[in-house]
Regions:
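Short, ordered secondary-structure scaffold segments
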Residues: 2-51, 57, 94-170
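Repeat-solenoid scaffold signature
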Residues: 59-90
Length: 170
C-alpha cells in the first residue's frame, strides 16, 4: 500500500503522491495520479501547487519556510539563529514563540494587522515602531534540568501535566 524511493523516501500511499527536491526536501504532496517523468521537462510545472495539494518551500539551510494547504492558504515560518521556530503566520494571525534554551517558555498570538514594523533610528539602532502585542499568552513550566513539561499556564488558569517515566504526557 506504500512505495518508497531512494533513501527511504515515501513516494506514494493509498491517497497521496510525494515529490522531493534535489536536497531530499518534500516539495509536493498531491492526490494527482499522473505526472511527468523527469525527462519530460515539465516537472517544475507539475510541482506547482494546485487546489487539493500541499506544497512546501524550504530555506537554504533546510528549514521549512512555508506550507501551502489544499485550500490555498499559506502558513509561513521564521526561525532564530539557533534554528528554533520563533514565528508562524497563518490566516491573519501571528503566532510567536519564546525559548529558554531548548524548551518553549512562552507562546502567544495576535492579529497580523497589529504587527509592529522594524525601523532604523537616526542613530542606526534597529527597533520596532511600537511594542509587539501579546494576546493569549501561554507559559510552559518544565521539570528542573529536563525537557519534560510539568505545567501550562494560560491567563489565570494553571494546568498540571502528568508524564510517564520517559517524559511523555499521559
Amino acid at each position: 500500500d506504500r512505495s518508497y524511493g531512494r533513501g527511504g523516501q515515501l513516494r506514494e500511499d493509498k491517497k497521496w503522491r510525494y515529490y522531493y527536491d534535489s536536497h531530499g526536501n518534500l516539495v509536493l504532496k498531491t492526490m494527482r495520479r499522473s505526472g511527468p517523468s523527469l525527462e519530460t521537462g515539465m516537472r517544475d510545472e507539475f510541482l506547482a501547487w494546485q487546489s487539493g495539494d500541499y506544497a512546501y518551500t524550504w530555506q537554504g539551510n533546510g528549514m521549512l519556510r512555508s506550507v501551502t494547504r489544499p485550500d490555498g492558504k499559506t502558513v509561513t515560518f521564521r526561525y532564530d539563529a539557533l534554528g528554533r521556530r520563533i514565528e508562524k503566520v497563518f490566516d491573519g494571525r501571528v503566532y510567536r514563540y519564546l525559548w529558554d534554551g531548548d524548551v518553549i517558555l512562552h507562546e502567544w498570538d495576535y492579529a497580523e494587522a497589529d504587527r509592529p514594523n522594524t525601523i532604523v533610528t537616526e542613530t542606526g539602532e534597529v527597533t520596532l515602531d511600537r511594542p509587539e502585542p501579546v494576546e493569549n499568552l501561554i507559559t510552559w513550566v518544565y521539570d528542573s534540568d529536563s525537557y519534560v513539561p510539568t505545567a501550562k499556564i494560560v491567563g489565570d488558569k494553571h494546568y498540571s501535566i502528568i508524564s510517564d517515566y520517559i517524559g511523555r504526557p499521559v
